[in-house]
Amino acid sequence: MMYSKIIGTGGYLPSRIVSNDELSQSMQTSDEWIYSRTGIRQRHLASPDESCSDMAFYAAKRALENAHIEADAIDLIIVATSTPEHIFPSTATVVQSRLSCQRAAAFDVQAACTGFMYALNTADCFIKSGQYQNVLVIGAEVFSRIVDWQDRNTAVLFGDGAGAVVLSASEEAGILGTILHADGSHKELLWVPQGIGSSETDFATRRPFIEMQGREVFKFAVRSLTHLVSELLVQCQMSADEIDFLIPHQANSRIIQAVAEHLNLPIEKVIITVNQHANTSAASVPLALDYGVQNGIIKRGDNLLLEAFGGGFTWGGCILTY
């Protein structure tokens, strides 16, 4: 049986770091208020001249270097993002050009914070079908551009960054199983209402920023993700004690804790970066994975459970052997 296996990871975070204390100087909040509710201490924010494709490119370069593979060996590039700098062309095509991946196909996917899981599954299917051998999968976001910095309920939650993996055909076990879900009936609980195709034409009434009903999102996320991880274990015919590390979407420490407790996983078996990165949306999971790999926490042969939840609602996850 042919598998798809992650052979390299990479990450990129903008150099500007904004602490909770710095945010408290421009809005009614505090480090204690933010940290106690989210687990976030700081976030990285893109500079004015830094774009989504810039960050995707830097993360991709590092993933290629760590995979010890040349750019011209890549068959396909998939970028998961909700914050591209262009309506078209896709961010993936911009990255393809900058990497000089001359023969690679390229496209974007959009599933909000679950985007990387959707992109990874798409890459996995392409490889298992035999169509492609090496796929570059990237999650990249500049959510600072769609956050209302006067709204403390959302502004404190998000950061910018990019994470990437090289997924390659392998006879060794890699991705063992994936489950994806969506429920569009709850779209208004977490969304950016204004889009280019919106029927709203009055600029004064446009709503171009993230709007969220936090309490409802939290309840739905915990319920959905705890059920999801149980589904994944059944699909892969595994028990929770066979999971070496949980790599969750880094949105909120309380959601992360709820999923870990459902799996009876000690916190030492959970990769947590939300305190340093905040919620980087589609970049969240690959950034956390890269953090674990680069710091020697995750090793070859470890069984990993990845999961994410985002606007839509969308949610999904996979179990893989690293």
UniProtKB/Swiss-Prot annotation:
Its EC number is 2.3.1.180. GO terms for cellular component: cytoplasm. It comes from the Bacteria. The active site is at 113, 249, 279. Belongs to the thiolase-like superfamily. FabH family. HAMAP family: FabH. This is Beta-ketoacyl-[acyl-carrier-protein] synthase III.
